[in-house]
Amino acid sequence: MTAAFASDQRLENGAEQLESLRRQMALLSEKVSGGPSRSGDLVPAGPVSLPPGTVGVLSGARSLLLSMVASVTAAGGNAAIVGQPDIGLLAAVEMGADLSRLAVIPDPGTDPVEVAAVLIDGMDLVVLGLGGRRVTRARARAVVARARQKGCTLLVTDGDWQGVSTRLAARVCGYEITPALRGVPTPGLGRISGVRLQINGRGR
């Protein structure tokens, strides 16, 4: 089973776009209903793992976000990235991501939260870029309840999500270099083959 979706620019308005997403999520749910459940799987987040249904805020280096997408899709799960038009999918592939199991909605319109809420129905992981928006506690509670019910992990970036208890911050603290000359490390030469992240997290 594969899942790959994108914004359809031919849709006349946001309501039609949401209705199209709802139909696709309903179809996806029907396809996976007879398969093995991943509801017991944890989503790796660096040195920690997030249980299904967790809603958290992620800030800092995107390498952590991409590694989580890679882990979920490589394990046979489905993931979606909403409102992140400049996300580096090549980096995700290099980490092992299966793009056939990744939905990308670069432009979710004026209400990315609603788009993410629809995607929660058929995904194991949804990454939501708020684009600087603020989500109130009342609305956040409704989405959190839906994520818990469906067993979908929701990661929020680039905005203010009120009332969330799980927060992760990642920053690059070093690089792995592949030597260019006969395996001998030489300052200024070589290829960056990986990054080292410092990850700070808090939550209940």
Curated annotation (Swiss-Prot):
Q: Which organism is it from?
A: Mycobacterium tuberculosis (strain ATCC 25618 / H37Rv)
Q: Where are the transmembrane segments?
A: 63-83
Tagged with keyword Membrane? yes
Instruction: Please identify the protein, giving its name as recorded.
Output: Uncharacterized protein Rv3395c
Q: How does it sit in the membrane?
A: Single-pass membrane protein
Keywords in alphabetical order: Membrane, Transmembrane, Transmembrane helix
Q: Which GO terms describe its biological process?
A: DNA repair
Q: Name one GO cellular component term.
A: membrane
Q: Spell out the subcellular localization from the entry.
A: Membrane
